Amino acid sequence: MNDWTALTVTTTTEAIEAVSNILMEAGAVGIQIKDAADFKKETVDAHGTWFDPKTVPHLASGAQVIGYFDPATSLVEQRDHIATRVRGLAQFGLDPGAATVTLADVRQADWANVWKQYYHPLRVSRFLTIVPKWEHYTPQQAGELQLTLDPGMAFGTGTHPTTQLMLSLLESVIRGGETMIDVGTGSGILAIAAERLGVGDILATDVDEIAVRNAEANIKLNPVSHITVIANDLLKGITLSADLIVANILAEVLVPLIPQVRPRLKAHGHFLLAGIIANKATLIIRTLEDNGFSIAQRREAGGWVALDAVIKETA
């Protein structure tokens, strides 16, 4: 009997996280990502590398997201539905690519441990280093902060430009002791990083129960104790106010979120947004301005945009 069924979606770099979420919602217990773009970049940038590309067989183009499922899961029936959802990402401005879906049986040893040899600590910003949970790591300089994560989980492990942009914005605005709401927390990486950087109480929300469980698992791997994770749809029903509100989600989800943020953000607070494809930035900025915000910072990387929005000062 085979230990796992692997469902592979052929897609594009920009759709990786969205496809990962689709597979997790379908019941995947683990996610593997193969992205040709990782091997087109320099192997070591200013902040190091998460894995050793020289040792990894890799794609020449495009990307593959592989979900690992219990063999008892009926994927033959789900395959067409998953393909339809992936193709539907186009309506959110994401290129789904070929959106082909294939199935294969694999043994436990083929994926559960072998892939770990390729993952190493990754310096993602001035102060933050992401470390896979099985690695022992000693900080390399004063002030360096370690974020321990399980990169086998979906919902963001720090390698995507949107996550790194958001982490750099957090470093730029945190002064210590703030309250924060993390909308669409995913892996919990932003909440964990924020507390490590000095934020006080943090409420992390996600509409997906699987993401909530993943965030809780990652939080337990880190020396943090002021993060509460709940399942919730954006800010609906949230009554508390915060100094920082962060959201690394698709532009189409940011648009309805923006009006919800204004009454929840304290005066002189910061609303940090990422997950914005460059061609959607104008839409998001216009929506922010229409809701009483101005742009304090704009950062870009890899075709993605992150924004630091503040409440407009009145004359």
Swiss-Prot record:
One of its GO terms (molecular function) is protein-lysine N-methyltransferase activity. It is an enzyme of class 2 (transferase). GO terms for cellular component: cytoplasm. InterPro entries: Ribosomal_L11_MeTrfase_PrmA, Ribosomal_PrmA_MeTrfase, SAM-dependent_MTases_sf. GO terms for biological process: methylation. It holds the Pfam family PrmA. It is found in: Cytoplasm. It catalyses: L-lysyl-[protein] + 3 S-adenosyl-L-methionine = N(6),N(6),N(6)-trimethyl-L-lysyl-[protein] + 3 S-adenosyl-L-homocysteine + 3 H(+). It comes from the Bacteria. Keywords: Cytoplasm, Methyltransferase, S-adenosyl-L-methionine, Transferase. Its EC number is 2.1.1.-. S-adenosyl-L-methionine binds at residues 163, 184, 206, 248. Methylates ribosomal protein L11. Belongs to the methyltransferase superfamily. PrmA family. This is Ribosomal protein L11 methyltransferase. It comes from Lacticaseibacillus paracasei (strain ATCC 334 / BCRC 17002 / CCUG 31169 / CIP 107868 / KCTC 3260 / NRRL B-441) (Lactobacillus paracasei).
